[in-house]
Swiss-Prot record:
This is Serine/threonine kinase NLK. Belongs to the protein kinase superfamily. CMGC Ser/Thr protein kinase family. MAP kinase subfamily. Disruption phenotype: Defects in body wall muscle, endoderm development and pop-1 asymmetry. RNAi-mediated knockdown disrupts tail tip morphogenesis resulting in retention of the pointed larval tail tip in adult males (also known as the Lep phenotype). RNAi-mediated knockdown causes the transcription factor plp-1 to localize at much lower levels in nuclei and instead accumulate in the cytoplasm, during embryonic development. It comes from Caenorhabditis elegans. The gene is lit-1. Has a role in the Wnt signaling pathway controlling the asymmetry of cell divisions during embryogenesis. Operates in the AB and EMS cell lineages influencing cell specification. Required for body wall muscle development, endoderm development, pop-1 asymmetry and T-cell division asymmetry. Component of the beta-catenin-lit-1 complex which promotes the phosphorylation, down-regulation and subcellular relocation of pop-1. Regulates plp-1 nuclear localization in embryos. Plays a role in male tail tip morphogenesis. Its cofactor is Mg(2+). Its main location: cytoplasm. One of its GO terms (cellular component) is serine/threonine protein kinase complex. ATP binds at residues 246-254, 269.
Amino acid sequence: MVSWGRGKDAYYLYISREQEEDDDDSLSFYSSQKDTEDEFCGCLFPDPEIPGSSSSSGCSSSSTELYDLAAAHAALISRQQQILSQAIPIIPEHQLAAVAAHHQHHQQLHPSVQYQLVAAATHHNHHQPQAAQPHYSAVVPRSDVIQQPPHFALHHHLQNLVQQQQQQQAHHHHQQLVGEMALVSHTHPAAVGSTTCYEKNQQKQQQVQQIPTQPQVAHVSSNAILAAAQPFYPPPVQDSQPDRPIGYGAFGVVWSVTDPRSGKRVALKKMPNVFQNLASCKRVFREIKMLSSFRHDNVLSLLDILQPANPSFFQELYVLTELMQSDLHKIIVSPQALTPDHVKVFVYQILRGLKYLHTANILHRDIKPGNLLVNSNCILKICDFGLARTWDQRDRLNMTHEVVTQYYRAPELLMGARRYTGAVDIWSVGCIFAELLQRKILFQAAGPIEQLQMIIDLLGTPSQEAMKYACEGAKNHVLRAGLRAPDTQRLYKIASPDDKNHEAVDLLQKLLHFDPDKRISVEEALQHRYLEEGRLRFHSCMCSCCYTKPNMPSRLFAQDLDPRHESPFDPKWEKDMSRLSMFELREKMYQFVMDRPALYGVALCINPQSAAYKNFASSSVAQASELPPSPQAW
């Protein structure tokens, strides 16, 4: 059994011989994980599944403890060789022979697995094999690529190969005992006339790859909402934690459930009434297309999409994503102490994820603390792309201004602008920055007009040039109120109470510039001096793009610390989608879902026998009365 623990100096990998089945969840120290109580894990969040603890979208406001960034940074400098940023599934040495035999026929193996094979061969050339209790080979660190393929499927594939060879050997031994002349070939099992164990297992594996049109529940407890659509090997140990709702919004309901294929806790988002109208259909199609393309430390990625059993009943969508332990809103309102180091690391990660989105030609349009998921290691991920849309940076297209939660809405949106850019997301980051510094919402107004007035009270009356995208009614309202000077003293009080941190004041002013054309860009904000320490801490011990190899004197940093999206969305895609009817969009969405390969090669389905199924089926999105107020109709 493999698990991560954290000591005073580094992360450590625990290897137990009690269980040989690898769990990919325990090999990632920055993803959602169920933390056990041991002497190395003293700065973690409470378990998200225990009542009263924080979760990714729950309602609890209990105290949480964050990772000590300063201690981690100092520890990494002193003992960098002990840091393992990621590990691959470990193969017992007594099973490496099966992998080597398979390697003769399939030349393409993971480089780290080949490393183990070479190491094992070298070991056996110098030492005689001993019939002792099997031990595990050394852990090989990951490569320097951010987007790593999941190792879970590879490990289970190797387990299947090992089991196949064991079955062949047992069958061969049985044939010798009964005196039969036929021998089972390890390399050509099909040469045997009768059906061998190898062939039976091959047939079983082929059946697993075939996804039936009518899924049947398999390998699932009666309490689990998710079930595998077909049998698979090996059946994981069922998680005893109950499935439960953890949040809901205008476009979906999120539950914390167990993936029956891995035993890992994941977030299941239910999107009902997808085809209620054309706007809803476009919004859902945008969201799943975006989530499918994300591969970034600071952006929530899609794990799987449940395939509909029948296209005639394709009315709602079920999406699996990572499960995080809390969000930034719960941290801000909790009694947890936030140091300047925490603020710098959080703001840096928000901007880092936002750069990834903007370079993909995506506007999030709802950046707020509740949509910024955080785990106990202070890894932050941007989530909830229900209001996001693609955007042509060279052309200002007419878009709705009914976006962004009011407290974090940019002044151009409050003033009815129909043409806007990624500057609306930058304004939201500025509001969150101030909220982290003073532990309260910066502009907390009862309505949009009061919200605009609070902004003017702080920043002063804008010029005509700064209001060039606003509608005439909003301009007249601002001008009738008279001229107001900016409250510079209050800005300094928010960003620098001790009157020493002038860099924080400078960044806050640039993020909260009234004129969207003069507001700082995400690339410029990432290069601001205030965030230099946050960048250093993040890439010293938290990111997946930089790492430390054994016997290396220093940490290896990625060439691009703030990567761009690899394949930006073509602005024409949004225009082409606007020309389609709802029937055509439904067909495209169905084809997209069906063409996407299932995670681990095994499809999932909803289990109607689950004890929580009735509550899950009846769960609905937020009602109109629960939603924030609409923008002012100027």
